[in-house]
Amino acid sequence: TFVYLPRLTEEEYDAMMEADLRDAIRDLPEVAEARGRMTKGAARMILLKYYMIKGYFDKAETLARELLEMEGRVYSLQPDYNYIFSKEGIGNNEVILQLACNNTASWYSNYMTAEVLPADYPWAEKATGWGGYVMPWDFYGTFEEGDLRLKNVVTAYTNKNGEKIDRSNSSQLAKGALPLKYGMDPDMKDGQSGIDVVIYRYADVLLTLAECINRNEGSPTTEAIGLVNRVRKRAGLSELDDAQTASGEAFNEAILLERGHEFYLEGLRRQDLIRFGKYVE
């Protein structure tokens, strides 16, 4: 006789998941033998994301500080933002967990560039552009002038026929800019890139810790402001102004905007908007 086990309660499931991740943090190595393998840092990031979803900001702050203690020894903030997502940057120590890719088999490849490119883009012979993702113009307009994170976001281009393409004559660009975050893999073929897909990285630790401090204290501290400014400095921007740090609410708004600019096309925006109560706006 086949017997169905009773469904766990949410509390039982959460407790089991948390215990499993705590065991993983204890037992896994700090540095993986190969890209994409689980480590202490990756397990901490998964648990950190769980705590943030559940609103356990005290626990999340403690865990984020454990990751902060790994800076220099295991992780660091790369000086060049765009290097993180380049062929040369594969295996860089800002990345905590990645989907290891190559361009020898379709099921191991990064298709992000192919999914963004229009069919007439100059790279399209290698990338077989599918004309998919865009960065909406409203969101593009929230970036500050000189933000280095926009370096690989294309607002206009000359196509394979030598024609100038912009938002006035392209149905794709009319919707938004082209977020070519992962750039071109020179060895790309048929849209298959060998640049790793980033899942978690150290900049997320800094901004998450800043958010936790603000939520737990009720207002931004010097430490929390400094964590955000580290990310902004790498992007070529000035420090947050007085209005952005005047209250806990204002600082939360600044963090949410910074997270959007820092992590575009990395799959984090939906959970961020839900956590900040903005998803249904």
Where are these regions (language model features)?
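Acidic-aromatic pocket-rim loops
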Residues: T104-T128, E266
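N-terminal targeting leaders only when they are immediately followed by extended low-complexity/repeat-rich tracts
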Residues: A119-A124, G131-G132, A177-K181
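Active-site core of glycosidic bond-cleaving carbohydrate-active enzymes
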Residues: Q98, A124-V154
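Acidic/polar-rich alpha-helix caps and helix-coil junctions
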Residues: T1-N110, E145-E281
